Amino acid sequence: MKFSPLVDELIQSLRCLPGVGPKSAQRMAFQLLERDRKAGAKLADSLAKAMSEVGHCQSCRTFTEETYCPICVSTKRGHSEVICVVETPADVLAIEAGGHFSGRYFVLLGHLSPLDGVGPDELGLDLLEQHLATGDVSELILATNPTVEGDATAHYIADMAKRHQLTVSRIAHGVPVGGELEYVDSTTLALSFNGRLPM
């Protein structure tokens, strides 16, 4: 069934979000139009404002409205000579929520994927290399995803960092806390055995 052109346009627009299919988009559109027009107007305003004002930090490439993000300009971060390399701004939020890292970040905005036309230039690795060349960085922590592309990206960056005589490490992978072994896949289990620690 066809709705009015504006309703159809709203439904189609909502489908651009990850995990939102036609039925979910229709439910969202109807919720906003039927029950919460004020929230819909606020959503539209926030979205328009974010799209026009949010860009990327010129140092780490995460999202910010300023030239540099709050993390990069903070004088309270304890290990500013340590850079954690992540794939997305969402990864920065996840690590910050844990509260166990007090260094700086570099956001790749993706991973190496030659088949998709994503090479080192698209990931801003020239900017990362500039950071490494300053001599202000002592360690690079690679926190790319444990995928084929994430592994390839980590190896590429590790080789680049070693040319600058930096300490390079990669975050550990293995059995999650609270996980049960019978539900863990064989690759994760192998990583857990290979990365075991003495007690």
Curated annotation (Swiss-Prot):
**What ranges of residues constitute the C4-type zinc fingers?**
57-72
Biological function? May play a role in DNA repair. It seems to be involved in an RecBC-independent recombinational process of DNA repair. It may act with RecF and RecO.
- Which lineage is the organism of this entry classified under, starting from the top rank? Bacteria, Pseudomonadati, Pseudomonadota, Gammaproteobacteria, Alteromonadales
Q: Which domain of life is it from?
A: Bacteria
Give the family from UniProt.
Belongs to the RecR family.
Which GO molecular function annotation, any one, does this entry have? zinc ion binding
Keyword Manganese in the entry? The reply is no
Annotated Toprim domain residues: 81-176
**Key words, A-Z:** DNA damage, DNA recombination, DNA repair, Metal-binding, Zinc, Zinc-finger
Q: Which InterPro entries match?
A: DNA_Rcmb_RecR, Rcmb_RecR, Rcmb_RecR_Znf, TOPRIM_dom, TOPRIM_RecR
Q: Pfam families, per this entry? A: RecR_C, RecR_HhH, RecR_ZnF, Toprim_4
- This chain's protein is named Recombination protein RecR
Coiled coil stretches, renumbered:
none
Q: Which PANTHER family match?
A: RECOMBINATION PROTEIN RECR
One Gene Ontology term of the biological-process aspect is: DNA repair
Under the heading CDD domains, the entry gives: TOPRIM_recR
UniProt xrefs under SMART domains? TOPRIM
